[in-house]
């Protein structure tokens, strides 16, 4: 007889396997999922699913520790971090560990400690994962009801949501405490070219913090990605941590309202799709943050942003040609606009040439040369400091371009040093992974809605090639 529905339809999500079957939850007969469907076999085995999640956390933390130690072992203190392909040490340096004025690394021991702590933690998580996957109870509902759940139990699900929110809030406050009490964090805007400092004067004004959310995402505005001082960043974490913690308490104490019970799909696959959607949003925001923001991701560690490298080149050649006698205030370029300086449509004096599109860049090496109406001609003639020239020349030659076609005027050389900026790596990886997560969100949301509506057909298995093959065993 032709099977119209996939086996999965007959294993509704609320079924509890009680562990009496030797292989319950391990084979296609008991779960409706083949071995390659991974954790789908464990949908109703809360104990085994716990093991899978703990083991996964162990793998993540093991990677963090091992990669951390690998970067420490290969680190050359005399070279900038962004020239060495590092993606973890810049994060530790940004948190103020091991660095001094100007972002110079003065002690690598904290990085070593971080790697070892992550390795030790991964061993604990790995043991827990193996224990719960192989030895622990298959389901937690009978023995440990607090940790047990049924996917349809809306009250339990929002309690779990609340616990997660509280943990996220604590994570946000860890950064706040580091910045306020435990040595401070690295501030690229500190006078004289950046330094580690404690953040004393937090921005807690809701109009400022939530004003970022109301900004346009386009040039000159830049939504939350435009944040450019640490007081706002740390103050934002106070707000976010508080909202997460109070929201978590709220979700633990309350049951979902009727409109939420009706509007949402309440199944394991639905929760998976919600989570993937959230992670996709995180990935896209992280991509924009690491690409454009040089405060949360200081250029001393991650290399310049694209706009920063382009503006640095304009500045470098302005300095050179001014020394050679050019009048940078009035020289015309090939388009009839100013060669070195021009006016933006709103009247500010900005760098001329192709870098004009990046007129809204803010960077610590450039801001001292601005006046009330943009770049100040008298400061450009008299006040340029050697450290600004050095830094802009360094950033000009380390643009995070990869092989883009439109490079904002940055001189590109096919025989140049083999260099890929960590900004390119981090922005691209987070965009690509965010996109994959978004596709996964659509896929699982569609399946969850179909299952809830009762028309999940599944694939017709009658003519599948594997049915005519010899069994593996």
UniProtKB/Swiss-Prot annotation:
Q: Decide whether keyword DNA repair is in the record.
A: no
Binding of [CaMn4O5] cluster, residues: 367
A Pfam family (short name) is PSII
Q: Which residues carry this modification: Phosphothreonine?
A: 15
Q: Which GO terms describe its biological process?
A: photosynthetic electron transport in photosystem II
- List the membrane topology term(s): Multi-pass membrane protein
Transmembrane regions listed in the UniProt entry: 69-93, 134-155, 178-200, 255-275, 291-312, 447-471
A GO cellular component annotation here is:
photosystem II
Comment on bound cofactor: Binds multiple chlorophylls and provides some of the ligands for the Ca-4Mn-5O cluster of the oxygen-evolving complex. It may also provide a ligand for a Cl- that is required for oxygen evolution. PSII binds additional chlorophylls, carotenoids and specific lipids.
Chief place of localization: plastid
Q: Which GO terms describe its molecular function?
A: chlorophyll binding; electron transporter, transferring electrons within the cyclic electron transport pathway of photosynthesis activity; metal ion binding
Q: Which UniProt keywords apply?
A: Acetylation, Chlorophyll, Chloroplast, Chromophore, Manganese, Membrane, Metal-binding, Phosphoprotein, Photosynthesis, Photosystem II, Plastid, Thylakoid, Transmembrane, Transmembrane helix
- Where found? Plastid, Chloroplast thylakoid membrane
Task: Please give the residues making up the propeptide in this record.
Answer: 1-14
Family stated for the protein in its record: Belongs to the PsbB/PsbC family. PsbC subfamily.
Under the subunit heading, UniProt states: PSII is composed of 1 copy each of membrane proteins PsbA, PsbB, PsbC, PsbD, PsbE, PsbF, PsbH, PsbI, PsbJ, PsbK, PsbL, PsbM, PsbT, PsbX, PsbY, PsbZ, Psb30/Ycf12, at least 3 peripheral proteins of the oxygen-evolving complex and a large number of cofactors. It forms dimeric complexes.
Q: What is this protein called?
A: Photosystem II CP43 reaction center protein
Q: Tell me which species this is from.
A: Vitis vinifera (Grape)
């Amino acid at each position: 007889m032709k099977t119209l529905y996939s086996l999965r339809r007959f294993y509704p999500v609320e079924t509890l396997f009680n562990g009496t079957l030797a292989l319950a939850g391990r084979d296609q007969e008991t779960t409706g999922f083949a071995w390659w469907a991974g954790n789908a076999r464990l949908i109703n085995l809360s104990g085994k699913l716990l093991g899978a999640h703990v083991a996964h956390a162990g793998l993540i933390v093991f990677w963090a520790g091992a990669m951390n130690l690998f970067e420490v072992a290969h680190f050359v203190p005399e070279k900038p971090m962004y020239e060495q392909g590092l993606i973890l040490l810049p994060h530790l340096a940004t948190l103020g560990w091991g660095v001094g004025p100007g972002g110079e690394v003065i002690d690598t021991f904290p990085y070593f400690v971080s790697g070892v702590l992550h390795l030790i933690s991964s061993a604990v998580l790995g043991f827990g994962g193996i224990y719960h996957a192989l030895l622990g109870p298959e389901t937690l509902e009978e023995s440990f009801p607090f940790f047990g759940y049924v996917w349809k139990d809306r009250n339990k699900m929002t309690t779990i949501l609340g616990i997660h929110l509280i943990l996220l809030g604590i994570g946000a406050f860890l950064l706040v405490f580091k910045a306020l009490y435990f040595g401070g964090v690295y501030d690229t805007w500190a006078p004289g070219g950046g330094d580690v400092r404690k953040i004393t004067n937090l921005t807690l004004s809701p109009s400022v913090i939530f004003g970022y959310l109301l900004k346009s995402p386009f040039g000159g505005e830049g939504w939350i990605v435009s944040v450019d001082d640490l007081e706002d960043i740390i103050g934002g974490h106070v707000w976010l941590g508080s909202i997460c913690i109070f929201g978590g308490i709220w979700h633990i104490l309350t049951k979902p309202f009727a409109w939420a019970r009706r509007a949402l799909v309440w199944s394991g696959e639905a929760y998976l799709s919600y989570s993937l959607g959230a992670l996709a949003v995180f990935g896209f925001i992280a991509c924009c943050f690491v690409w454009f923001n040089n405060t949360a991701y200081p250029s001393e560690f991650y290399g310049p942003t694209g706009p920063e490298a382009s503006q640095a080149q304009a500045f470098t050649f302005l300095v050179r040609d001014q020394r050679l006698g050019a009048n940078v205030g009035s020289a015309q370029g090939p388009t009839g606009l100013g060669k070195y300086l021009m006016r933006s449509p709103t009247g500010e004096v900005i760098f001329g040439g192709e870098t004009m599109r990046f007129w809204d860049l803010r960077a610590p090496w450039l801001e001292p040369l601005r006046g009330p109406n943009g770049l100040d001609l008298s400061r450009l003639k008299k006040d340029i400091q050697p450290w600004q020239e050095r830094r802009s020349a360094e950033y000009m030659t380390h643009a995070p371009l990869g092989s883009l076609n439109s490079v904002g005027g940055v001189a590109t050389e096919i025989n140049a040093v083999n260099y890929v900026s960590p900004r390119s790596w981090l922005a691209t990886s987070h965009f690509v992974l965010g996109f994959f997560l978004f596709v996964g969100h659509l896929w699982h949301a569609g399946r969850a809605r179909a299952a809830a509506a009762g028309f999940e057909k599944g694939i017709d298995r009658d003519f599948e090639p594997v049915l005519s093959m010899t069994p593996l065993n």
